[in-house]
């Protein structure tokens, strides 16, 4: 076993796994989605988390209908739990449709999604 500690996960009303994190020192509520290839942050929170864009916008496919505009960020500081600290790039994408669905089912809003890219690189 490595020296990293475990991070407490919460189960939402919709049975999604949630965790609290800090991104560039700011608190974030993140949904854990093993089916999401990339970790992402709600584009409206770019300034709040002090995220810097990298590259040009692109069309991203997801669970919603059609494609959505997205842009990558430079790596930023992320902290999960008390001791895990690392760097992570995110996809900035509009998550209003995700939050609307969660809200309609009585669940809390999320700031972003931890995807398979993060999970694979931080086994």
What feature does the model see in each segment?
Residues 1-123:
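Pepsin/retropepsin-fold aspartyl endopeptidases
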């Amino acid at each position: 076993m490595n020296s990293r500690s475990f991070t407490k996960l919460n189960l939402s009303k919709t049975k999604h796994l949630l965790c609290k994190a800090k991104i560039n020192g700011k608190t974030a509520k993140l949904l854990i989605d093993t089916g999401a290839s990339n970790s992402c942050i709600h584009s409206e929170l770019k300034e709040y988390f002090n995220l810097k864009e990298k590259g040009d916008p692109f069309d991203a496919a997801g669970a919603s209908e059609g494609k959505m505009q997205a842009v990558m960020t430079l790596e930023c500081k992320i902290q999960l739990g008390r001791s895990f600290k690392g760097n992570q790039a995110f996809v900035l994408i509009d998550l209003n449709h995700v939050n609307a669905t969660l809200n309609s089912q009585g669940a809390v809003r999320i700031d972003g999604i931890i995807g398979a890219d993060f999970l694979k690189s931080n086994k």
